[in-house]
């Protein structure tokens, strides 16, 4: 499935009161800063460019810059990088970027050839050449294969790092885009783009997609609000509108309900009322009237996939089903025909997974004859497999993972017997396994680059938060370092939107930071999904301060254990994580030495006015509601900034093309902080990266060069010879 899913009272601590001063007084003049609200406005771009140039010049003058640049470029452009892929009709398909192909290559090789150190790749689309031909940076965003005609794909793309996407039909046999094929261009020649407009094949001559065909077909969160069915050969203006959601909804999307081998005509339609509640429907495209039938399931339950004629649903809240209480976080399966029935008639429903205090659902993966249920047990992967025999689910078989603290990932097509599985952890590079039809895992690719895991330590520890709750965190360091309070330490967390932070392998972090004596820490604070729905809800809305307090608890524990001290403790976070670290800066500046605030959400009073802000109301609360506003103002980083307080050295990043978190957030924070004579700030604005580190490989490499130079210099990391 392609559905885009990515008890407490607020305690007002003394540090919160001190930081507030008078947050009813606006800290900037709205008239003077109005120009910063226009993402691509000439005055705003000039303002941002001047500050970006100044920051780049300062970073490049630091003694660590050249050495870090050399190391990071060697990692990014290394031909020995892990070759991730997916199996389709005897081939492994892979997307690859290097220094000669920064926009990337979509390519394939035979499965038998994939075992080799240097597979013989057949390039299908060269996105650098395509970008030159079009005259704009074209970024690859994914593909959708037509089962009825396996030689046809829909290639999703975007210009730069934008969330707005478009697609073109690709002929695998001719190795070229299809002339007059599916491509959202109007009769006037206008290319239609829309945020996350992934198309869905109905059959070889029909697709369903969510374009912005007319100006008013967007929601208040700036996502498409309409679904169309489009037949081959007809003008896009002639496409039939199937469904439209109200403007206050977030978005509408469509995908196949079941695999094409079972039914190609059934379409699952999701209308997102808010971030956690949905109106879901089934559309049978064989019905000439295209009537939508509403699914009878809890509104906050989400479709996770299908296997044969059964669908999997994840519950976010407790569900009283036939006088039985099914716990929030449970995964249930039921026959697709039961989706439309009343509760009393859902005879096929089966609970496949019930969460425990430490174990939560991660994802469902399927092959043609097998289901993989991946969970996190104390934020470490656990996997079982099972199947369906005579309409009964078989007993789950534990898939033994090769080492402790393993993290499991899977890429597969539901009509293929084989799948590629990746296993890794924070200090063990990824190994790719082939799941074969005999139900065995075979090593197919190991990391070709050298990294000696035996020289490093990965531990999971706990800190105690303000209310006694234990907050786990992972810590990585080089064997033999002394815990003398002087270790440069990077602490990361997210703490929002049910996102689970797990200890994946980061070659950059390990080789640039940990290898040089730095310490890396990943905190699993509340607001995330590491321990299920209640872990998230504990820091949702007016309870937001919980996430910040959890983060402070981990920070204080690192200092208490003499692992580091404020002078050497750096924190980084992006998007919601940017909000987290900026609040840490304003509420507890004495705890930290350096802060990277990346594509951050910072203007919490006006966030609904920018980008996708309207879609976040169920996460943060609504600043237009007095009680919500009261709580938001207590932590809102922009409103709580002081023009005299000495804050840690801070790096702020944003992007002109970020269509989720508008660059206004980063710009206004820099604008205000620049007036504080006691705080050193750096500011970097990208033109093309969108809500990420870069729209191509070179842009991403430069981003991390600047980031790690900033931390290495500010936190006094002593670089050894590379």
From Swiss-Prot:
Q: What is its EC number?
A: 3.4.21.-
What are the annotated disulfide bridges? none
Transmembrane stretches in the record are none
Which top EC class is given? hydrolase
One cellular-component annotation, GO = cytosol
Key words, A-Z: Hydrolase, Protease, Serine protease
Any one Pfam family match given in the protein's UniProt record, by short name: Peptidase_S9
In the record, what terms sit under GO molecular function?
oligopeptidase activity; serine-type endopeptidase activity
Q: Name one GO biological process term.
A: proteolysis
Q: Can you tell me which residues form the catalytic site?
A: 575, 658, 691
PANTHER family for this protein: PROLYL ENDOPEPTIDASE
What family does the database annotate? Answer: Belongs to the peptidase S9B family.
This protein's name: Uncharacterized peptidase RP174
């Amino acid at each position: 499935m392609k559905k885009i899913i990515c008890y407490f009272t607020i305690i007002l601590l003394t540090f919160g009161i001190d930081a507030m001063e008078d947050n009813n007084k606006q800290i900037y003049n709205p008239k003077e800063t109005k120009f910063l609200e226009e993402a691509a406005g000439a005055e705003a771009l000039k303002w941002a460019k001047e500050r970006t140039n100044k920051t780049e010049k300062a970073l490049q003058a630091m003694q660590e810059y050249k050495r870090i640049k050399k190391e990071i470029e060697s990692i990014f452009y290394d031909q020995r990088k892990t070759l991730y892929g997916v199996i389709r009709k005897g081939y492994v398909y892979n997307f690859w970027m290097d220094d000669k192909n920064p926009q990337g290559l979509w390519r394939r090789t035979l499965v038998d050839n994939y075992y080799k150190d240097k597979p013989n790749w057949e390039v299908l689309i060269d996105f650098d050449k395509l970008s030159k031909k079009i005259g704009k940076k074209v970024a690859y965003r994914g593909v959708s294969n037509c089962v009825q005609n396996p030689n046809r794909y829909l290639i999703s793309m975007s210009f730069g790092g934008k969330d707005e996407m478009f697609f073109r039909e690709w002929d695998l046999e001719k190795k070229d885009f299809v002339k007059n094929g599916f491509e959202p261009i109007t009769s006037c020649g206008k290319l239609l783009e829309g945020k996350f407009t992934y198309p869905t094949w109905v059959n070889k001559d029909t697709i369903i997609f969510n374009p912005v065909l007319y100006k008013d077909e967007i929601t208040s969160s700036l996502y498409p609000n309409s679904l169309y069915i489009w037949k081959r050969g007809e003008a896009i203006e002639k496409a039939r509108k199937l469904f439209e959601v109200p403007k206050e909804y977030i978005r509408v999307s469509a995908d196949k309900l079941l695999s094409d081998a079972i039914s190609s005509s059934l379409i699952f339609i999701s209308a997102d009322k808010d971030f956690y509640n949905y109106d879901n429907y089934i559309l049978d495209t064989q019905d000439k009237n295209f009537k939508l039938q509403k699914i009878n399931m809890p509104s906050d339950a989400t479709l996770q996939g299908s296997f044969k004629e059964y669908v999997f649903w994840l519950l976010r809240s407790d569900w009283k089903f036939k006088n039985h209480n099914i716990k929030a976080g449970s995964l249930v399966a039921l026959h697709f025909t039961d989706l439309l029935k009343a509760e009393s008639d859902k005879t096929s429903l089966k609970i496949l997974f019930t969460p425990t205090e430490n174990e939560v659902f991660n994802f469902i993966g399927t092959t043609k004859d097998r289901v993989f249920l991946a969970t996190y047990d104390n934020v470490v992967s656990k996997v079982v497999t099972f199947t369906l025999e005579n309409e009964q689910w078989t007993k789950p078989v534990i898939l033994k993972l090769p080492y402790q603290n393993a993290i499991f990932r899977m890429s597969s097509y539901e009509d293929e017997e084989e799948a590629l599985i990746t296993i890794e952890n924070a200090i063990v590079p990824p190994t790719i396994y082939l799941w074969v039809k005999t139900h065995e895992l075979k090593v197919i690719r190991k990391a070709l680059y050298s990294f000696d895991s035996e020289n490093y330590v990965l531990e999971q520890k706990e800190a105690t938060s303000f209310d006694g709750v234990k907050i786990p965190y992972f810590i990585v360091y080089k064997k033999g370092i002394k815990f003398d309070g002087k270790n440069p330490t990077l602490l990361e967390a997210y703490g929002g939107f049910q996102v689970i932070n797990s200890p994946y392998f980061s070659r950059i972090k390990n080789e640039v930071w940990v290898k040089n004596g730095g310490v890396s820490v990943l905190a699993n604070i509340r607001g995330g999904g590491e321990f299920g729905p209640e872990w998230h809800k504990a820091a949702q809305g007016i309870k937001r301060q919980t996430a910040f307090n959890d983060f402070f608890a981990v920070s204080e524990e690192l200092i208490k254990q003499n692992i580091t001290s404020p002078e050497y403790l750096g924190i980084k976070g992006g998007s919601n994580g940017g909000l987290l670290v900026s609040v840490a800066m304003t509420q507890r500046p004495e705890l930290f030495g350096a802060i990277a605030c990346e594509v951050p959400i910072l203007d919490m009073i006006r966030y609904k006015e920018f980008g996708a802000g309207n879609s976040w109301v169920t996460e943060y609360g609504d600043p237009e509601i007095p009680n919500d506003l009261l709580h938001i103002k207590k932590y809102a980083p922009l409103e709580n900034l002081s023009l005299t307080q000495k804050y840690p050295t801070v790096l702020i990043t944003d992007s002109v093309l970020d269509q989720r978190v508008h660059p206004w957030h980063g710009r206004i924070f820099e604008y205000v902080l620049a007036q504080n004579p006691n705080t050193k700030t750096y500011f970097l604005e990208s033109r093309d990266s969108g809500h990420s580190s870069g729209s191509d490989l070179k842009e991403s490499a430069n981003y991390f060069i600047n980031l790690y130079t900033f931390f290495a210099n500010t936190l006094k990391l002593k670089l050894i010879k590379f």
